[in-house]
Amino acid sequence: MAATLRELRGRIRSAGSIKKITKAQELIATSRIAKAQARVEAARPYSAEITSMLTELASASALDHPLLVARENPRRAAVLVVSSDRGLCGAYNANVLRQAEELFSLLREEGKEPVLYTVGRKALGYFSFRQREVVESWAGFSERPTYENAREIADTLVTAFMSGADDEGDDAGADGILGVDELHIVFTEFKSMLSQSAAARRIAPMVVEYVGDEQPEEGPQTLFSFEPDPETLFDALLPRYVATRVYAALLEAAASESASRRRAMKSATDNADDLIKALTLAANRERQAQITQEISEIVGGANALADAK
């Protein structure tokens, strides 16, 4: 009985220690959400505007540029999977990895071989454990990404994308680099504090997108004068466009990670509270039973002495 009481008290102490950790993680995540959400809201207009601008320029120039025109018989598609560096964030990583696997299946059905790039240690660990080749990975900034991080990733993706234009069959082209024909990104889209969902987006060749439910107005289209020529302009805008889209995705993923971690840690803290209450009640009952038994033994001993006299 004493051993059982000692075990219950040990479990109460363990649950209390875990509760302190989860509560601290919850508070840290809560403090980061507001800043992350503000960065998402600040980046969205620029990302939407550069996409809209390139779409309008494309319709005005009729330029046959790799950013705008899908290649014939695409063979490979780069997929950037954005995960977290740390755990304790509920189903955040599981959802984005499931979305990535669904995209891989879709690409293979279309005859395209996925070429894998990852952000975050969790995605790298997942694919490495399954012996899936990861061309390049980045880690250490999933919660606080910067534009420099996005630009580094974008430079790698753009190089692979532009190199894919001259590839022949399954072999590298004249530049000696085995490129890709499409660029995709899988990340967690931040909708609100309580709602985040995994999403897959194709960023090159461009897909015409309209913000919200807005549709292009009917009537005369805007005329553009290009200086320098359209091809030079698009060559300069391609890395910036990809970097902007990657940066927006990284910010959304960071905000979603903090929101998921806060929700998971709050649930863990509440569960620890419930467990401590249940264990405390069990310990009190055990202690009460122990005291009752001791009293019974004392009374029994006293009665035995009285009978002996």
Swiss-Prot record:
PROSITE patterns: ATPASE_GAMMA (PS00153). Keywords: ATP synthesis, Cell membrane, CF(1), Hydrogen ion transport, Ion transport, Membrane, Transport. The keyword Nucleotide-binding does not apply. SUPFAM superfamilies: ATP synthase (F1-ATPase), gamma subunit. GO terms for biological process: proton motive force-driven plasma membrane ATP synthesis. Signal peptide: none annotated. Produces ATP from ADP in the presence of a proton gradient across the membrane. The gamma chain is believed to be important in regulating ATPase activity and the flow of protons through the CF(0) complex. Belongs to the ATPase gamma chain family. PANTHER family: ATP SYNTHASE GAMMA CHAIN, ATP SYNTHASE SUBUNIT GAMMA, MITOCHONDRIAL. F-type ATPases have 2 components, CF(1) - the catalytic core - and CF(0) - the membrane proton channel. CF(1) has five subunits: alpha(3), beta(3), gamma(1), delta(1), epsilon(1). CF(0) has three main subunits: a, b and c. This is ATP synthase gamma chain. The gene is atpG.
